[in-house]
Amino acid sequence: MGSEPPPSEKKVREPFSRAMKDVQISDEQRLKELWHLLDLLEIEYKKTADLHTLISSVSESLTMVWKRRDPKSELALKGLLLILEYCLSHVFDGHAVFEIFVSSLGFNTVIFWKHCAGYIFDSDLGRGTKFRDALLFSLTLYDVNTGKNRLRELYAAVPGIRKSLLGVNAKQFGERYHHLQKRLARYGSHTSLCSVSSDSEGEEAIHNVRSGTHTESESEEDPKAPRSGLATSHFQQRVINVSNAPPVSLKREKTGDWEIKQGSGGLVACVDPVMSKDHENLWLANLGMNINDKKQKRPGSVASIPESFPSTNTLGLPLIKQTIAEVFFHVLADDDMDAPKNEKQKKAREEMSLLGVLNNYNRGNYKLNPVVVQEDDYNVYYGGISNGLLWPALHNLPEYIVSEYDDEKILRAHWCAYVRVNYQFAIDAVRNSRPQDFIWIHDYHLMLVGMIMQSLDQHLEVGFFLHIPFQPPGEFFSKYSTVGFAVLRGLLRFTKVGFQTHRDRTKYIELVQHYFGTAKIVYDNKMDIYSITNEGWTCSLGVFPVSIKNDDFLKFVDLPETIKLKNDLRKRVMGDTPAPDGRFFFSVERFDYTKGIMEKLQAYKRYFERHPDRIGKDVLFQIAVTNRRSVDTYRVYQDECIDLADKINEIFKDPNNPTWKPLVFQTDGLPRSELVAAYLAMDIGVVTPKKDGMNLVAKEMLVCNPKAGLVLSTGAGSEIQFTTAGLYSDKEKNYHRISNVFDPDSYCDAFYSAALEPEDVRAEHGKRLHEFIMANDIERWSCAFLDPSWTHEVIRPTQVETLDDFFSLMMKTRNVRRQIVGRVLKGIPIRSHFAISLRNAKESLEQICKPGTHTAEFKSGPDSKEVAHFEIDNELQEFERDLSFIDYVQSDDADNVEQFVDTLISSHPISVETYKKEVENAVELLYSADHFHYFFTDRDGTLKSYSCSYPSSIQPAYSGVIQAQFARRCAQTCVILTTAPLMHIGVLDVSTIPNGYYYFGASGGREWFIDNGHNFKDESILKGEKADVLASAYTRISHLLEEPEFRPFTWVGSGLQKHYGHLTIAFQDVYKTITEAQGKQLHEEIEKIVKDVDPHGTRLQLASTEFDIKVYMKTETDGHVFDKGDGLRLLCEKMHCDLTEGNVLVCGDSSTDIPMLKECLIRNPKGVYTIWVTVNDKLKEEVRALCASYSNSNVAFVSCPEVLLGAMAQATIREITITRTRKMSRNIV
């Protein structure tokens, strides 16, 4: 492509070469550019005048030419870039064509983004464009609409883009500085920190704070790699609450000063108790003060900037235009006011400014951070699609969906605004969060935030609670499919989702089953939790009926002023001389069509028509708090209700009581004290919404007035909760239920039965409701939702009955342990559900052990009578150690490594003193070598104590961390070489160390795993018919083990394993559960099988160890048995390892490891250091003699793997200390 292009090609404009003011060229000009380029490429096309049609028809052809990598490829790439330039210049009106364009790239998106990144960055930096932000939002919208993960592909292609968007480096600097301050505060000085800390990041931070240098720990792959044996964190878990509305109300006085008050809405009442527990908790919300471009424009600054550019910059701030980048601070700082005249006035002004008021609020409460978006976007997102489409649709009231959304163009435009606002909330949430935090998103305004957050950082735990019903009509997924499917898919991207009622969750699951046929749905009957896995994401769904903070209402009940208000109100409503059997009905709600106010009034009118005897007696006091009058559907509905209320008062009059009015209709709300007084004054509460998430009014009424009756519709979530709890049944009806609010006759019957209910019966029913609500308050609701134990990520208590149950449970713990190891190594704090999982697994196994023992019994199959007896002492011990490890790793102590390693003392088979001496000897050997070029080690018996069976021998998390840190700090090339298979219950299945720390050699070194893209095998195995001999032996032995007397050998130890080049049949375990006679009988039968399939003994060789029988296939070259020495040679050949260089550490525990040691001694007799885990004197002597034959005395012996792990940990600490000291010396110099 380096040759000079033909003259005709020079006429094709360079993509992304226009200045900001020239970006919006005409479609006609772009058409001519594309036509010319297509002609040069000789691509056939229809010369249409519609640019979208042309792009849609030629994008795939351009991609094909570009992928060919021929002389025309560069020109085709230029065409693709011109199309991208157009799409990013028309983000909103051109998104449909952008989706087609991205789809046409197929599997080439990553390489395409790499090609185009330079063009985009150069344009933004040199010409003032904002194409980078346009691309980020366009891909976000694409992912939302299609369910793909194209945004993550962009991050993979250009990693720095995500960092700059989220301010990752700034956040890391802040966290390091906080970490450093805490260390300095504890130890008092720089010097003491150096002397006691095992974390060199502290010293590096000191240097970098002073010099501003960049450290290697800020690398993309491992941004938080700890500098010590174990990672620590000084930040505790916070709750980050994210909602559209804030928990406060803001008011600006005429003086310009701001006043902030605690809000009183339902969301605040629900969440405030949780948020107030910790001042570090954070609430993100929109304060109603957003960016208005029209108000912010200044002469010559932004008039030429296209309105189609997105609303966030690369730091996630809502700043479209570079020339008004400071607008966010203008919004909060109130700089439109006159400058203060003196310092005192300046200080007072600062304190009463919005920024000052918020700062003062944050000092005494949890932190409140504003989310600022474009005002036009917000108006469309909130007043348009949220309340004009989502609200009525999710309440199953399609007749109230705004008619403008019948226009697909308007629907898409408003949907873009909804996505943009969710995008901004998601960016702000990620930027303000830490990995250990729980981010709690609320309600239908922000249903896409979880999906967008996961694309930015998949390590975050993000929950969502829907406060309204989820009952969308069928047309939501046909007529409004753009919105419907994105909402359905978006909820599945949260870690956990809470619904108000079982009805809503059931509806959601039915829709997922119908529209996402491949989704896997699992129900846990004990926990009443669904887990749904779709497109690689898993979400847990629970039901959590929201409640109230009882004390917020009860504190008013007995106050003298409340009693007076109650009496005055009852007298005002019922009159001076009310009828003895007259009833005070009370209803209070927002003036919303979902509340069923119109239907209530119609039923109340019918009530007096059918029961004229109630005229002059009963009064309904209806409070309908006016809201959303600016929305046409609300205004019309409210006016019609008021007209009907006036009509009722005109129709029904009592000649004997002229002052009586059947209805008191009020549109102003009441303060809390007066509301409680109304609850106390009423006889019967009326809560009858068409559809409502929960409706807390019913609970407030009965908490305050246990003697009151209740008329409740099935549209209220609280009614479903009461029914589920048994408070309304055939035998016991504690309230008057309305099943159909649209049937005025049955509705008025409920009024009538409530009015005639005897007071003592009514009080008894009210008491039962009161007791239930008191026992299920808001604290219980929030704790239940935040409880980490109910998510799919947690191993729940389970009944372990069969071997499959046991092995499956252990594999689940492997997954948890891998996450623990990965997080600790990266410095990411550990979530609480890891400890819950391990504790649940441990307790599940303890429950099946015989009393006073660690002997577990498992059935060999679900319907089998055979019982396997396992000693699971090691498995339980490793659970206990890992739980202890989690506690230590989260401590702030600089010596948490040493503290945890000290706990391993109890594992020594002899004594504490022996443990300490062995560790000292092993550490001295490691110290003498200083550093190792190569580390070769066995696994089982060396790094891991033997378990009852191989599938249960999961590497514990603490071991994974110690081994990985040793590999990172003390050796260059680390290798685990074992006789176990590689996969299918092999060494990779039971390991918890992340890829990249160790090479894994399996089957004695005949098969190797280097990394995901690099594996190889020994090619010396006999081929053709000769290779079938081992397979024949395996088949014969499998059949043998199916016989009843040999069945126990299928589950003892490693069972029957087929390796690459040999077989292993366990005939004993470490607990000696198999008798000598049984083992001898098995050995004899296997000998017969081997002789039958290889009568001349030229192909197979039988060998026995303490625990198993091995059937080896001889090599093709000289017919000897392949051993670990051969495996090591194979590795050196394939990976070009030169063992003559540097020091080599070899660790083993049995005679099968001797060839590995010998091969190393042959190549590097002086540089080999070896530690053996054994108490066998004969084996010790063999090792000593072998080393002595090469004039090598670098030998140490330990009694158990835990001693070796302790020594490795100590060596790692020493290596870090040396490294730290060297770095400090350099800094001092």
Curated annotation (Swiss-Prot):
Segments of this protein annotated with the region Disordered = 196-233
Query: Is this entry keyworded Transferase?
Result: yes
The reaction(s) annotated as catalysed by this protein in its Swiss-Prot or TrEMBL entry are: D-glucose 6-phosphate + UDP-alpha-D-glucose = alpha,alpha-trehalose 6-phosphate + UDP + H(+)
Composition bias, kind Basic and acidic residues: at what positions? 213-225
Q: Which family, according to UniProt?
A: In the N-terminal section; belongs to the glycosyltransferase 20 family.
PANTHER family given in the database record: ALPHA,ALPHA-TREHALOSE-PHOSPHATE SYNTHASE [UDP-FORMING] 2, TREHALOSE-6-PHOSPHATE SYNTHASE
Entry protein name: Alpha,alpha-trehalose-phosphate synthase [UDP-forming] 2
Per the UniProt record, the source organism is Caenorhabditis elegans
